[in-house]
Amino acid sequence: MKHNLPADLVTLWRDSPGYESARSRTFNQRIPPELPYAIVRPKNMEQIQHAVQLAVDLDKQIRIRSGGHSLAGWTLCADSILIDLVDFRHLEYDATTAIASASPSATSAQLNDLLVPHGRFVPVGHCGDVGLGGFFLQGGMGLNCRSYGWACEYLVGVDLITADGEYKHCSESENADLFWAARGAGPEFPAIVTRFFIRTRPAAAKYEKSTFIWPVACSDAVVSWILKILPELHADIEPLVVSTIVPGLNVAAILVQFLVFLSTNETGAEKLGPSLTAMPDGTLMEFKGVPTSIQQEYVSQEGTMPRDSRYICDSVWFKDGIDFVTVTRRMFREFPRDRSMVYWEPKYPTSRRQLPDMAFSLQADQYLALFAIFEDSQQDEEQGIRIQEFIQEIEPYVLGTFAADGMPAVRKTQYWSAEVIERLYSVCQKWDPAHRLGCTLLDPTRKVKS
């Protein structure tokens, strides 16, 4: 036993066998160099409390890893205690209340698989291996977010361990300030979530996907068309637009995908058809009404964003009312290279809703992200600079950034509204006055360690 830790609590010190393998348990193979003081893998609540006490005794910062999908590498902080929840697992559905409960290490795919037999649905992430911890805490840009809302809005309660090791349950009526923060604080959340309680909604009976691909030179016409149809596009349709080098065609192209959520007797043509009447000519390929499922979409996504690659990502919320076609033209046409892509996910009409009282507070009609995807570590600097060059060009039109897809180490931006920043800082000061858990997005005087 070292530092009075239980013998059965897996604790890896820097000189322990398996330390580096545990440190590098991340989706992004572009792994930050920071070395945690120790990596702890608890299996139950008591062991999480022991890990927190270790950090308190040693006066170390704490980082939490759920699924390891953070592209920015939030979980790696020099000389910290990394609490990896990979072995702390819970996933359950209560049919009497239609409430699911899940540990942060459960993934989007696992939650979806749990709910499918019950005919229930939560707008889980677009990547199946995204851990629910980071997903919910950062707001949760889930499936058909534009209509079904942010995933964190589905939370009805949270169990957690505080920065000093106490268990708390949080809801709108109990420890409400922590519950407020759990819905959007992201890496600044001042406690360790151990269980989410999630309301569910009826699932679609079936899904269809329609995909259309144009040469990238047609981007103006395609983007204009999407902007035109958004106000009337059926609420059960999720549109995604990607500009990339399309495998097989080996040309830069702009791709539009519609995922249609259907009841038993509905067809995709009924819901999507009216929006296709003004579709631009000149497609390279069309795939209409292809039956699919969330599970199948996850398999497809694994091919687009595999675990064995290096990623650099930055994203923006655009100010509403700008000339979106003109502002994004060069991005759509010139950014695609190799496997890199421009990803546009319109958020209208949910972007016009008054959000519930929660920490997640920054949204706009248009969300866009740039992804550099590559294998060679020698390209790290070049790829990062290239993304920032494109971002700097559009900076005057930017409202802020989605915390899950940002580059805080290189670009200062807005992640929350000004009012929420002040309130969130107060909550963090109350529950984590030693700043063991925060990742520096709130206070610019604290060093960014990702």
Curated annotation (Swiss-Prot):
Its cofactor is FAD. It comes from the Eukaryota. Pathway: Secondary metabolite biosynthesis. The lineage of its organism: Eukaryota, Fungi, Dikarya, Ascomycota, Pezizomycotina. Belongs to the oxygen-dependent FAD-linked oxidoreductase family. This is FAD-linked oxidoreductase ptmO. PROSITE patterns: FAD_PCMH (PS51387). The gene is ptmO. It comes from Penicillium ochrochloron. Keywords: FAD, Flavoprotein, Oxidoreductase.
